[in-house]
Amino acid sequence: MNRLIELTGWIVLVVSVILLGVASHIDNYQPPEQSASVQHK
């Protein structure tokens, strides 16, 4: 049981870090598109 708990804890940490990385990349990519659309208008 302890190993299962440790594995689930590590999996949750890895998934959360990956989600944070993806979210940060999405946040970084969105602003240029919005600014470009505003400039075209």
Swiss-Prot record:
From what organism does this protein derive?
Escherichia coli (strain K12)
Briefly state the modifications made to the protein after translation: The N-terminus is blocked.
A single GO CC term, please? plasma membrane
GO annotation, biological process: cell division; cellular response to cell envelope stress; cellular response to stress; response to antibiotic
SS bonds (residue pairs): none
Write out the annotated subcellular location: Cell inner membrane
What are the transmembrane regions?
Answer: 4-24
What name does the UniProt record give this protein? Divisome-associated membrane protein Blr
Q: Which NCBIfam families match?
A: small_Blr
Q: Which UniProt keywords apply?
A: Antibiotic resistance, Cell cycle, Cell division, Cell inner membrane, Cell membrane, Membrane, Stress response, Transmembrane, Transmembrane helix
Q: Which domain of life is it from?
A: Bacteria
Function, in words: Component of the cell division machinery, which is probably involved in the stabilization of the divisome under certain stress conditions.
The membrane-topology field of this record reads: Single-pass membrane protein
Give the quaternary structure.
Interacts with FtsL and several other divisomal proteins, including FtsI, FtsK, FtsN, FtsQ, FtsW and YmgF.
Return the InterPro entries for the record.
Blr-like
**Null-mutant phenotype, please?**
Inactivation increases the susceptibility of bacteria to a number of antibiotics that inhibit peptidoglycan biosynthesis. Increases the susceptibility to cycloserine, bacitracin, and a wide spectrum of beta-lactam antibiotics. Does not affect susceptibility to fosfomycin, valinomycin, tetracycline, chloramphenicol, gentamicin or quinolones.
**Could you tell me which residue ranges are on the Periplasmic side of the membrane?**
25-41
* Ranges of the Cytoplasmic topological domain: 1-3
